[in-house]
A protein has these predicted regions:
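Conserved beta-strand positions that form and line the central face of beta-propeller blades
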Residues: 70, 125, 320
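Non-catalytic terminal accessory segments
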Residues: 1-119
Length: 357
């Protein structure tokens, strides 16, 4: 089954179940009359938003897409608020429960949008065995999951580039999903003032959304901006092996066979692996990889996805993890997918200081 079909099925299940859940909350907990009409209206709006954007990229359709994203946020927030209201038994103390239930959404939505829009810099330090003197005390940047498309566009990308360039990193590693997967005009990426600058290069590995846009298109867009795309490939830079593997969604493959047999990888040399998802950690550690950079999880982005991610990725859904000489950094990403909102997560890039162990 192709990535587009999988994406469609997951989105359809989420939309239908989410709207059904909101209907049950509104109809039987908040006792809102004719609530099903509101649900049907927004369901049609949300379902049509992606189709409209695929048909034509214009201001009106982007606005509809944005509103549908906010509506998805309202659905997720409704589950969060319902749990709070229900377990605190607030229905016994509040008159006009439905009014206050949805009034509470306003400050939450504002907070969530700011958490998504304002990109923080998370700073960490990684000690690597036998790190070449050249890289000792050098700073690199890890970015991922910007999801440029209908919502996050030119101004947001410009802000990200300025924030990265301000850090004056020696190298920048982007672990996939710079694009949202929808076809759009990205000609503005060729503006020189918006190019990411790093003395030792900017490197990219494909994410699952990159397959929907097409690896050829991604290569053309990024190549024109001096970004090196590593598709199951490796290069060595001043004694440091830099490996980029395709997303597991993009292509199922054996990691050991790919790294050991196809590439000139040496476990005796220090290495950085770019892999979109934080998966196959035990296998990667056994290969002697020093630092794996991943994203994809968005740090959960919104409740209850943060709890689901912790289960799916066995706790390796966000942050820096260390086991022996192996390090894993999972970033929550610089952008969002679906709702342009974040709850219990932040948009970020990661500044990593490399030190010799």
């Amino acid at each position: 089954m192709s990535m587009k079909k999988v994406f469609f099925l997951i989105t359809a299940v989420f939309f239908i179940s989410g709207h059904l859940l909101l209907f049950l909350i509104g109809q039987y907990y908040l006792n809102i009359e004719f609530f099903y009409l509101i649900i049907i209206g927004f369901f049609v709006l949300s379902a049509s938003a992606s189709w409209l954007m695929a048909w034509e990229d214009n201001y009106l359709f982007r606005f509809i897409y944005f509103i549908s994203g906010i509506w998805v946020g309202v659905i997720l927030n409704s589950l969060f608020l319902f749990l709070i209201f229900y377990f605190l038994n607030l229905q016994q103390y509040i008159d006009n429960l439905a009014f206050w239930f949805f009034i509470c959404q306003i400050p939450i939505l504002i907070f969530e949008f700011l958490s998504a829009y304002l990109i923080r810099v998370r700073k960490i330090e990684v000690r690597i065995k036998d790190l070449p003197d050249y890289w000792d005390n050098k700073k690199i940047v890890h970015a991922c999951d910007l999801h440029l498309g209908p919502v996050w566009r030119l101004s947001f990308y410009e802000k990200l580039v300025k924030k990265i360039n301000k850090l004056q990193a020696s190298a920048v590693f982007i672990t996939g999903d710079l694009f949202d997967g929808m076809e759009a005009d990205f000609s503005w990426l060729n503006i020189n003032s918006f190019k990411i600058k790093a003395t030792e290069g900017v490197y990219y590995s494909l994410g699952n959304h990159d397959e929907m846009l097409g690896s050829k298109t991604v290569n053309e867009l990024l190549g024109a901006n001096g970004i090196k795309v590593l598709e199951n490939d490796m290069l060595e830079k001043n004694g440091l092996q830099i490996i980029g593997l395709n997303s597991f969604h993009h292509l199922k493959y054996d990691i050991e066979a790919t790294i050991i047999k196809q590439l000139s990888y040496s476990s005796s040399k220090p290495s950085i692996l770019m892999l979109h998802e934080p998966v196959s950690l035990a296998k990667i550690q056994s290969l002697g990889i020093d630092l794996q950079l991943s994203g994809h999880t968005h740090g959960g982005q919104m409740f209850p996805n943060n709890l689901i991610n912790k289960i799916l990725y066995l706790g390796h859904d966000f942050g820096l993890f260390k086991k022996g000489d192996f390090h894993l950094n999972v970033s929550s990403g610089a952008g969002t997918w679906g709702p342009p909102l974040r709850l219990f997560s932040r948009s970020e890039i990661v500044e990593i200081t490399l030190r010799k162990k």
